[in-house]
Every structure is written in C-alpha cells, then in structure tokens.
C-alpha cells in the first residue's frame, strides 16, 4: 500500500501547481502563517494572484500581510499602477498640465523658426550662403550624372603575344614604384589642401557655434598628439573661425611653437591674453617665444608672473633659470672686469667672508676648498695628459666656460637684474663694504667684489695692527676674487699680506697654494699645502693636492725632489685653528692649551669620539673615522693612540703622506711605539721609498709581539729559510691588534682571515690550538658571506653558532641572498643542533623558519643526502623535546613538514 502511494502521489495528495511546482497543500492559511521562507511565499503569492488554481481574495490578502511582515521591501509586494488619464486629476490640475504642454510646444516652434528663417531686413545677405529649401524644383540626380560620366573611361585591352616578347619586367616594376611614390606625395599635399581654414557660421546660434568650435578643436588636439602640427594649426584656425576662445589661441600658439613660427605664436598668445588676461599657459608660451626672439627681459617678466600664480610650476622655474643665465651672459663686460682674465668657474665658494657669523663661514671643509680650486685640477690633468709643461696664464675661456660661472648662484644675489651695482662709496663703513662684497662674490661678480674689498682695506689700513684680523680677512677675500678671475700674482700678494697680519691662517695658505699651482710653481704650492696639513690634516683638498703635486715633482725632479723644496715652516702647537672653531666661539677666543689637563667632560667626550671612530673603522668607514679622530685630537693632541689609529685609516685609503705624518707625530710622543714604527714603514713603502722601508721593520723586530712586522720584512727581503715538510699555502694576513685601549676593533673580515691555517706539524713539535675567531655582527650580505665562508673553511661550528646568535632571524634570508650551498646549509644545521638548541630553542625555531624562506632552499632539500637528512631530523627531535614558552609541538611539526621530513 505504501509503495503504491509513492508511485501515485496524486491519489493521496493534491498535486502541484503548474508554475513553480508548489504543492497544493501549501496554499493554506496555516502553512502560510508558519512559513518563514520569503522566496517561497513570493512564489505562493504569485500563484494566488495569477488565478491558475482559483481566486482566493482573503488568502491572497493574508499572504501579502505575512510577506510584508517578513520582507517589507520585497518586489512581489509591488502592484502595477496604470497610466493616469485626465479623469485621474481634478479640473484645475488638468488645466495647468495642459497649458504647460501647449506653452512648451509653442516655444519649441518659435525657436525652430528663429534658427532657420530670418527676416531679410534684419539679416541682409544671409540667404546666399544657405542651401535652398528642399522642394519639387530641386534636382537630386546631379551626383549620379557625374558618376556615370566618370565611368566612361577607356577599357584596358589585354596584351597580345607579340608584345609579351618585348616586355621588360624590371622597367615595368620601376614604373609602378615611381607612380606609387608620386601618388603618395600628391595625396599628402591634397590632404592638407582639402582642409578649409574657415567655417561658414552664418545663421547658427551660439550653441551651434560652440559645438562646431569644440569639435574642430578636438580634431586639432588629435593631430597635435600625433605630431602633425601643420594639420593641428589648420584645425585650430577652423575652430577660431567658428568661435574665438583663449583655449584655441593657446593651442594654436603651442603648435606654432613646435613649428618654430615665433611671430605667429606671439600674436596668438597676445590674443589669448586679451580674452583672458591672467591665462598662465599664454604667459608661459609667450615667454618661450620671447626667449627664442632674444627678448630676455620680457621673458623674465612673464615667467615671474607665472610663478606668482603657480609657485610650484617646474617648467616655469627651469625656463626662468635658463633665461636668467642667458640674460647674465649677454650683459656687457664692465671696465673693472676687463682688467683680469676670466677662468672657468665650476661652482661658487660657500662664503667669501672668513669672519662672518655662523658656523658655515667659520668652518673650513673640503667642499668650499674644492669650490675655491676652480678649474685648476682639470687644467693640471689636461697638462699631464698632453705631456707638455707650457703655461696657461694667457688662455681665455670660451663662451661655454663663461656660462658655467653663474650656475651656482645663491638666493642672495639678484640674478635677474641686468644692471651692475653702483661703485663703492667711501662713506660706507668697512663691515658694510665687506658684506656687499660677499654678496657680489656669491653672485659671481668677482671684479665688483674685489673693488668693495679694496675700499674697505683702504679705510682700515691707517689703523695698522688694531684691526689686523679684519684686514687679514679682507685681504684673503680679495685674494679669492683674484683667484676666480685668474689674476694669480695679485692673489699671491694679498695672501702674503693676510699671512703677515695673521700667520698660519688656513684660507690664505690654501689660496696661495692654488695660485702657485696655477702658475706651475709646484714647490711653493707643495710647501703651502704641507703647512695647511700641519695646521689641520683633516682638510681633504690639501691632502689630495699635496699627493698630486708630489707625483708631478717626482716626474720633474726624480727621486730627489724633496731636496729641492723650500723649507717647510714649523707650525707652533699653540696656534689656534680659527676656521675650525665651533659656531658659539669667536676667532678671538683662544682654545685650551695642549698642556692643560682636560676636564671630566672632555675625557668623556674624548672616549666617546674614540669609540665612535673605532666602530667606524670596524665598519670600514675610514673617512668618517678620520673626522672622529680629528675631533679627539682637538681635545687632546698628545694621545699617541689616536695618531696611530688615524694613520691606519690613511693607509687603508692609500693616503701614505698623511699616514707618514701621523706616524712621525706618534713617534715624537712615544719613540718606542711599535705600531707607529710599523705603519711608518708601510707608509714609506707606499711612497716607494724602498731604502727607508727596510729600516723600521728591522727595528720593530726587537719587540717580541711584532710578528706582523717580521712577516713584512720577510716578504720585502725574501730571506726567509725554506720550510720543512710539504709546501704550505700563503694566506693574506691583515693587520691584527691585540690592545683594545689603543686600537680600534678589527673588522669581521680581518678577524676571520687573520689566523693562518696550519697544514702540518713538524716532527717533534706540538700542534698549537687554532686561534678563536672573533665574529662581529655583519651589516650587509657581503660581510655575512665573507664571515660565513671563513667559518666554513675552518669547519668551526662554535663560531657559526655565535654568528647565528648575534644575527636577527628575520635578516637571515636577506644576508644569505642566493649563496646557500650544501656545505653552508649543513654547517648551519650542525651549529644549531650542537650549540643553540639546548640554550635557546625559540631562537633555533626562528632561524629554521626564516631559513626555509631563503633562496635556493627547495633546491638544497633535493640535493642533500640521507645522512644530512638524519642530522636535520635529530635537530627537530631535539627541538621537540626541549620545552620553551610560546613554542608548541604543532609548530615544530609544521616546520618539519617544510623541511620534507
């Protein structure tokens, strides 16, 4: 009975609806009340409204209420509303609607009549350009007649067999090519000639004219972007004929600038400015036309107007700088400038005032010295490359050299002014004259600056020694002006006078040395540079110049060039360094004498600076370390360790002359200093003084700890006895220091490679234990790779574990880079297993996690053998057995799966 009921549900149930196949039992009040399915209720409501199962108004209304409670915004609740008719409104409402419609229709008809039909009295001659009104008298078939006439052309007759015998293929092909080229040229010209430059706008409204103008402007923009500027000009002209606008004038001006039609572009820019006086683009493009028409002052005015509106306009800034440079170069040369010869000027010195306010005017650095050097270095290199030693005192730079003189002008100089400053007045005080001279010097007007300094000097000369410092500064500043102009002899005279007033002043010495070098008086220049280095050996310009002149003198005079030098004056140790004083001090304040005891704060500062310098040496940043050691020597100039440390930096940088000076100074303080003697020998060897290089290391051998000097002497004299046993390989040994109080710590690479490998032990001898590696934290991938390769060569698991302990795990993929090899990978695993897993399992887990993210990790897993996998498994077993906070067995198991274990 049950099976039959399932086979024939219609016998026991009521069936389903045709739409949606809903059971008939669901069309019931009780089911609809309990139903919470919105979609199903919507289907039931649709069936009830359709009436396919009968009309049940109450059930339909009940279903709507239930659906409203469940989903008030359901689309099924919406009912169709028929369009409203006149009967749907009241009489007043319908009358209002009807009047609005009638007024709209009449207004549209009136506008159509005004667009197409005009009064001949008000618009005479308008009907002529307009097409005739279409009517029965028009003949619409004129185009077809012309087409039929054009078709009556002579037909092509095939060639007969006799003509084919005389047919020349190459000749016919060349004819076809020529015809194709001619047609191509003709088509290009025809394309431009067919474009009319004027649009008939008679009878059009303003809206229609604006539409036509915008359409033609868009065509011009497309032609401009494609590079066809001629076509763009024609389309912009058509747009302007329809409706003149400032935008169209601007666009046509830009296209004409591309075609280099400066006059037409200028006219368009002026018309655009008439329509829109503050148009930025018009001003910018007019400035461009002024620039190419050599109207530089007008261009400057326009560009400044642009920058007032848009201060961040990069194009305006760039163009203004170019125009101002051209304007300055086009100025006539004054009478004062014709007295000297102009040199090539690459950049302007930071300040021409030595005694001005601020640390920038009182501190001497390499940048300002290089600026004061001018073009001397380049001239010397050219002289050496040519092999000649001819004088360059009469050379006049070209136009490009004159342009380079004004590239580095400061904001204090008014570069846009075309007039020259007025002559100095005798009534001005010396400080005002000096300040004005500094401004002129910064602006590149060296002759005018020298005139200002001369008047100030004339006012202060009668006072004598009362204003010696001020006079020294003025003479030095005027010497800088003479040096810029190439007047080296006057520069030397002023520097001599400045040094008479204030001996051992750095800037006059430097400028006199540059002038001597320009005049090719290299011995005097070398003496001045060496004097500067005695005052302050941290001036890079003096150091480089001394080394360069030493090479030149070696070429000129041979190995005995030092014997021909003038005597180098000895600088008193108590001589104050006026240019290196801090900003808070004045040149009149004397620093603390060298023999006075430093205070507690000085000792702390000295130690801090020394440690910073040692750390910089460890990081191989030798230049910054030298600056730190310079500060240390200002606090205590009797510290022998500082001189030896700085000598080491100079040796690393290849500055052997400075290293030699520091070593000699250290030996004056401590005559038995081993390191100073050894580094002095290295410096002399670097200077190729072979005779002197063999003396000091032999003296150093008296010390039992100077094994490095013994090796140096052995390599020089080549007198070491042959070793017994098998041949040992030579290892590069860098300088090793055992004293932490006197020397900076060794870099990671130096310490890693400092211990030579012992290949064998002689009979009867005992093997000495290998020196423990001093591993420091690497700062980049290169240093990490160098240290790791050294550790791998020694198979030192303890050193590798120490390296991993001081290395952040997140930095491991970056430090390894793509250098993960099989032996390196195995060494890392063994080090973690043997030394770190018991001490710090969390660190081991992090290292293993980040190691799996390194490059070539997956490749390494495919290359390791079974024994290496067992070691990895032992490491993970040890990691699982060790209890640690924050490390669960699930984490270790997930990491084990990454290692395919």
From Swiss-Prot:
Predominant place of localization: cytoplasm
Expression sites by tissue: Detected in cerebellum, tongue, esophagus, forestomach, sperm and testis.
KW Hydrolase (keyword) present: yes
Organism domain of life: Eukaryota
Keywords: Cytoplasm, Fertilization, GTP-binding, Hydrolase, Nucleotide-binding, Phosphoprotein, Repeat, TPR repeat
GO biological process: axonemal dynein complex assembly; single fertilization
Record-linked PROSITE patterns: TPR (PS50005), TPR_REGION (PS50293)
Modified residues (Phosphoserine): 351, 359, 703, 739-740, 766
TPR repeat placement: 213-246, 247-279, 280-313, 430-464, 472-505, 507-539, 606-639, 640-673
Source lineage: Eukaryota, Metazoa, Chordata, Craniata, Vertebrata
Basic and acidic residues bias: start-end ranges: 708-717
Gene name as annotated: Spag1
Protein name: Sperm-associated antigen 1
Further comment found in the protein's record: Antibodies against SPAG1 interfere with fertilization.
